[in-house]
Amino acid sequence: MPQPPIAPLVPPAHVVDLMTVAGSAVFGARWKAKEAKLVECPALSDSMPEFKTTYDIDPHAELLGFDDSAWPEVAATELGAKRGGGMVSFFWFRSALTIPANAAGFATAGAKTVLTVNVDDYAEVWVNGEMPRAAGRPSPATIQGFNMPNRLVLRDTVTPGEKFEVAVFAINGPISAAPANFLWFREAKIEFYR
């Protein structure tokens, strides 16, 4: 599997904060959220004989076109609110983003476009049903570290009108040292580079 693109380390030409009403409106973003649960399921068929069960998450909201219409809507300004029951907990956040020709004063055509999210404590980020990753290589969509941002290149040269379906799987952790706190977004933004 090829190395996923890495976001630039230089300052962006323009940033839009998705945690504001105005910022989310630029992309037509409506955030939905739902708690995810660990559920017991049968072990894989080639597991060692002593393993009869294992665990999966429910729902699998990373799928492109996943129906989140019954999920509660979360105002952009409420993305930073504490969610989950604390300890080991999981939450899905979903939104569709449409790239405008003009993003709050910035002409977007041809710009490198990066989605940055920072979830307390960890996140996995799916875009259009894919989580770009490669074993043994930096993979910005996967867990980056304790309270570290995920910075995914959405497109090297974006075209106005392009749509991105984003699903963020938020994880409260460390899992083996269950914290007495909750999960929330520290930041969510779109960065443009020239």
Positions of PLM-derived features:
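An acidic-aromatic loop/edge-strand motif
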Residues: 2-66, 71, 154-194
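Aromatic-lined ligand-binding clefts that engage carbohydrates, nucleic acids, or primary amines
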Residues: 62, 71, 89, 97, ...
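Edge strands and adjacent loops of beta-rich recognition modules
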Residues: 65-89
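Residues that flank catalytic or metal-binding motifs in active/ligand-binding sites
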Residues: 67, 91-93, 121, 148
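Beta-strand-rich interaction surfaces with strong enrichment in secreted/lumenal proteins
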Residues: 80-87, 94-96, 104, 140-141, ...
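Surface-exposed coil/turn segments at beta-strand junctions on protein surfaces, enriched
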Residues: 86-88, 108, 118, 145-147, ...
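Flexible loop/turn segments at secondary-structure boundaries
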Residues: 122-124, 133, 173-176
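Solvent-exposed beta-strand/loop surfaces of large extracellular or lumenal domains
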Residues: 126-151
